[in-house]
Amino acid sequence: MIEADRLIAADNPTFREEDVIDRAIRPKKLDDYQGQDHVRGQMEIFIKAAQMREEALDHLLIFGPPGLGKTTLANIVANEMGVNIRTTSGPVLEKAGDLAALLTNLEENDILFIDEIHRLSPMVEEVLYPAMEDYQLDIMIGEGPAARSIKIDLPPFTLIGATTRAGSLTSPLRDRFGIVQRLEYYKVEDLQHIVQRSADCLNLSMESEGALEVARRARGTPRIANRLLRRVRDYAEVMSDGNISSDIADKALNMLDVDVRGFDYMDRKLLLAIMEKFDGGPVGLDNIAAAIGEERDTIEDVIEPYLIQQGYLQRTPRGRIVSDRAYLHFGIDKPDK
């Protein structure tokens, strides 16, 4: 798997030791939340309305690509509502009892945040339905003919679910969310503000042009922007006086093999393989996987989304095709067909 080795992977387990820094630079209030203007505007209204009625916020589903701030938004909602938040993830909730234990410990108007909610087991989902709809738990006691169902009343609460795959949610679960928010890739100017704010939180000396250079190469993703910032900081401290200028940021990012479009080695390897080995496509995913020595799931879930979103790669019924933009980026003449 390449994901653990990619500096620009939006979800990279090798960088979990820096979670403490991530938490320090995460915004705590909607006023500090950069970008996603449509989401921020709507959530301000929904939160104020719930506070005026002195009731729990409606259940909220947040979906979008990795690294765009789903967990951050969930914590901001809890801070704005002035309530506690309990955090878990779909794969962790293996049994109905795991979910029941969390729900019965919630206080009135608290938030339960389930990351990767699309990975909940059907058994756990069945327990979640009445909890979301009626604030009740239906628990089976005993086995066989002696089994019986008991109902446990729950305090009003808010479930916030986060997923990168909204289409994988079952319809009954998806329909129980009263608020659904999609997070989009960030504009460069919004990412520049995020990078500058993170630099200020870390007490770094950073010029606005340096922040812009990092933002340009962050693939529209705050998590990647903050990760690149930390590596640029390392370069600036060792190779210069610690100040992050545009020139220092450019040299650091080039050293990290992140080009002006935010592409890394694997992005370029995939595009070049299609251009040089398959005449630009169409080519099937299995052939690409064999050509670059990578698993098809990793290509589909990790490498391709940004290339497609930026218009360098297309998925067609006949296979993958690189666009004219890709040929221009690499300075390669497009073959006549």
Swiss-Prot record:
One of its GO terms (molecular function) is four-way junction helicase activity. DNA binds at R296, R315, R320. It comes from the Bacteria. InterPro entries: AAA+_ATPase, AAA_lid_4, DNA_helicase_Holl-junc_RuvB, P-loop_NTPase, RuvB-like_N, RuvB_C, WH-like_DNA-bd_sf, WH_DNA-bd_sf. It is found in: Cytoplasm. Its EC number is 3.6.4.-. It is an enzyme of class 3 (hydrolase). GO terms for biological process: DNA recombination; DNA repair. Gene3D superfamilies: 1.10.8.60, P-loop containing nucleotide triphosphate hydrolases, Winged helix-like DNA-binding domain superfamily/Winged helix DNA-binding domain. GO terms for cellular component: cytoplasm; Holliday junction resolvase complex. Residues 187-257 are annotated as: Small ATPAse domain (RuvB-S). It holds the Pfam family RuvB_C. Residues 260-337 are annotated as: Head domain (RuvB-H). Keywords: ATP-binding, Cytoplasm, DNA damage, DNA recombination, DNA repair, DNA-binding, Hydrolase, Nucleotide-binding. CDD domains: AAA. It catalyses: ATP + H2O = ADP + phosphate + H(+). Residues 4-186 are annotated as: Large ATPase domain (RuvB-L). Belongs to the RuvB family. Homohexamer. Forms an RuvA(8)-RuvB(12)-Holliday junction (HJ) complex. HJ DNA is sandwiched between 2 RuvA tetramers; dsDNA enters through RuvA and exits via RuvB. An RuvB hexamer assembles on each DNA strand where it exits the tetramer. Each RuvB hexamer is contacted by two RuvA subunits (via domain III) on 2 adjacent RuvB subunits; this complex drives branch migration. In the full resolvosome a probable DNA-RuvA(4)-RuvB(12)-RuvC(2) complex forms which resolves the HJ. Has 3 domains, the large (RuvB-L) and small ATPase (RuvB-S) domains and the C-terminal head (RuvB-H) domain. The head domain binds DNA, while the ATPase domains jointly bind ATP, ADP or are empty depending on the state of the subunit in the translocation cycle. During a single DNA translocation step the structure of each domain remains the same, but their relative positions change. This is Holliday junction branch migration complex subunit RuvB. It comes from Aliivibrio fischeri (strain MJ11). The gene is ruvB.
